[in-house]
């Protein structure tokens, strides 16, 4: 209900969701993808699974339990294609078992000038001490965006960056401590 009321009566061309559940304990097994699709019924829908586990015993004080989630792109026009791409992640034990299988989705829309609008819905790693995986993920995304621009395509990337972007850490006064896993993009 909250998400569908956020548009304030406007009709956005694109809506990008991350951490949207299909059947997870954290959302009481409500299929949030189906809910979003029904609330934005005239929109085309593209879903990519990001995380699936029968039971995640983390954090130890309050288990995540069953998790089935992903990213969802809704658009008011049909895409010519939608492709899930995997980000590089930390494969070490136990990180591999507690971090999401990070991904991004590329949807392509033809334009009147013969090029494409390339829309990227991204969900990057968060808990990456030292920022190694996030640096690799950002490099991959930058490469793909640059390649698309070189073809003359228009590129929009949005999503959950799990980064502090260009001075945003000090943009709004706060007494909150910045966790050590936060990486600042410059």
Regions found by a protein language model. Give the residues of each.
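Active-site environment of divalent metal-dependent phosphoester hydrolases
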Residues: 22-25, 53-55, 92, 126-129, ...
């Amino acid at each position: 209900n909250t998400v569908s009321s956020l548009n304030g009566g406007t009709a956005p061309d694109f809506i990008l969701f991350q951490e949207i559940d299909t059947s997870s304990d954290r959302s009481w097994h409500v299929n949030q993808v189906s809910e979003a699709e029904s609330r934005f019924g005239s929109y085309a829908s593209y879903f990519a699974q990001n995380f699936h586990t029968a039971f995640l015993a983390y954090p130890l004080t309050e288990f995540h339990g069953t998790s089935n989630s992903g990213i969802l792109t809704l658009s008011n026009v049909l895409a010519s294609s939608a492709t899930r791409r995997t980000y590089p992640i930390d494969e070490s034990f136990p990180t591999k078992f507690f971090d999401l299988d990070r991904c991004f989705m590329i949807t392509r829309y033809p334009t009147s000038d013969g090029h494409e609008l390339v829309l990227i819905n991204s969900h990057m790693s968060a808990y990456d001490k030292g920022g190694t995986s996030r640096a690799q993920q950002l490099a991959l995304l930058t490469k793909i965006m640059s390649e698309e621009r070189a073809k003359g395509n228009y590129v929009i990337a949005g999503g959950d960056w799990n980064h502090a972007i260009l001075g945003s850490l000090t943009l709004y006064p706060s007494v909150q401590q910045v966790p050590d896993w936060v990486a600042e993009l410059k």
